[in-house]
């Protein structure tokens, strides 16, 4: 089969989607879907994720290069109570395990000139939708397989222009400290006469740290039975997905104290902004370049560069595309 130049360009453009990367490009308001990047700031990062080590940068606000497109990005006028959503580009879906959150930040004036350096507050979040007391699975995440995240503009939102930031965190590489962040910002103007006082207020960057236990989080071993969403609680004038508030039993202390050195596990809570103060070492994420690989060490997966064989009595088990482990 011969491919013309246009076909080759198209295949090249969707190649990141094949690897599981994606970008939020469309805004949806009361059921009406806008064009790609019509009201969402386009960024130079494209489909590529921001890794946990990079979330201390100012680019973590609306993504790399987004201010360059701010002036040409339109501002959508919405009323309090309007249903708003973000949709992924080119039919992609969220096939990375992890939570989703939406933040807002009021611009001091024209949102097109606003860099997001002010205060942010959370208006929505999605975590786990099933009882995970028997062990967390990829399909337990509320976002799994979806292409859209929707919420309602809180009724008491003060009028003015805002950045609205959607963020999905892929925890599939969290065991190695490389959780992936997918995020963009929309520009809106809220009408009405709302007099609410949004909060808790946070700064971006600063809302998370790379070493936070719910960011540097091992979803593979021991299999988690709880998870606490990162960041502040949802503003009381906002909405939190009630299906994500299922509580799971606390982590078994014996498992947490085993020789496996897991990432900290904390009680699942939709509104808690402070993870439980449980202490544990960071997970082992690499293996020798050759020779014998010890039990519970990584032995394969997409992007893994080590080599060797699992020690006697163990075998290399595939947990998912990115993580194989000697167990």
From Swiss-Prot:
Lignocellulose is the most abundant polymeric composite on Earth and is a recalcitrant but promising renewable substrate for industrial biotechnology applications. Together with cellobiose dehydrogenases (CDHs) an enzymatic system capable of oxidative cellulose cleavage is formed, which increases the efficiency of cellulases and put LPMOs at focus of biofuel research. The keyword Metal-binding applies. Binds 1 copper ion per subunit. One of its GO terms (molecular function) is monooxygenase activity. Its EC number is 1.14.99.56. Residues 1-20 form the signal peptide. It catalyses: [(1->4)-beta-D-glucosyl]n+m + reduced acceptor + O2 = 4-dehydro-beta-D-glucosyl-[(1->4)-beta-D-glucosyl]n-1 + [(1->4)-beta-D-glucosyl]m + acceptor + H2O. Its cofactor is Cu(2+). GO terms for cellular component: extracellular region. Keywords: Carbohydrate metabolism, Cellulose degradation, Copper, Disulfide bond, Glycoprotein, Metal-binding, Monooxygenase, Oxidoreductase, Polysaccharide degradation, Secreted, Signal. PROSITE patterns: CBM1_1 (PS00562), CBM1_2 (PS51164). Induction: Expression is up-regulated on steam-exploded bagasse as carbon source compared to glucose. Pfam families: AA9, CBM_1. The keyword Glycoprotein applies. Glycans are attached at residue 290. Has a modular structure: an endo-beta-1,4-glucanase catalytic module at the N-terminus, a linker rich in serines and threonines, and a C-terminal carbohydrate-binding module (CBM). The CBM domain is essential for binding to and subsequent oxidative degradation of polysaccharide substrate. This is AA9 family lytic polysaccharide monooxygenase G. It comes from Aspergillus tamarii. The lineage of its organism: Eukaryota, Fungi, Dikarya, Ascomycota, Pezizomycotina.
């Amino acid at each position: 089969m011969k491919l013309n130049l246009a076909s080759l360009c198209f295949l090249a453009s969707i190649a990141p989607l094949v690897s599981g990367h994606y970008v939020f490009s469309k805004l949806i308001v009361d059921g009406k879907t806008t064009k790609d990047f019509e009201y969402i700031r386009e960024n130079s990062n494209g489909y590529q994720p921001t890794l946990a080590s990079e979330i201390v940068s100012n680019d973590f606000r609306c993504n790399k290069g987004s201010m360059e497109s701010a002036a040409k990005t339109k501002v959508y006028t919405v009323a309090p109570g309007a249903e708003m959503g973000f949709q992924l580009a080119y039919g992609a879906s969220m096939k990375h395990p992890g939570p989703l959150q939406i933040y807002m930040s009021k611009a001091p004036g024209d949102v097109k000139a606003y860099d997001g350096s002010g205060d942010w507050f959370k208006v929505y979040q999605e975590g786990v939708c099933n009882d995970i007391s028997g062990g967390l699975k990829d399909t337990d995440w509320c976002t799994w397989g979806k292409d859209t995240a929707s919420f309602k503009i809180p009724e008491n939102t003060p009028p003015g222009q805002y950045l609205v930031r959607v963020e999905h965190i892929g925890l599939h590489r969290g065991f190695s400290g490389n959780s992936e962040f997918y995020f963009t910002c929309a520009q809106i103007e809220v009408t009405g006469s709302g007099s609410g006082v949004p909060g808790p207020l946070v700064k971006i960057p600063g809302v998370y740290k790379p070493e936070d236990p719910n960011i540097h989080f091992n979803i593979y071993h021991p299999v988690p039975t709880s998870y606490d969403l990162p960041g502040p609680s949802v503003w009381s004038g906002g909405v939190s997905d009630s299906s994500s508030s299922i509580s799971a039993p606390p982590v078994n202390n014996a498992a947490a104290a085993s020789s496996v050195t897991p990432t900290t596990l904390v009680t699942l809570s939709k509104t808690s902004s402070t993870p439980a103060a449980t202490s544990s070492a960071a997970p082992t994420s690499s293996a020798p370049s050759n020779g014998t690989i010890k039990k519970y060490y990584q032995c394969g997966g997409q992007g893994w560069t080590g080599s060797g064989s699992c020690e006697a009595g163990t075998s290399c088990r595939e947990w998912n595309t990115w993580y194989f482990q000697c167990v």
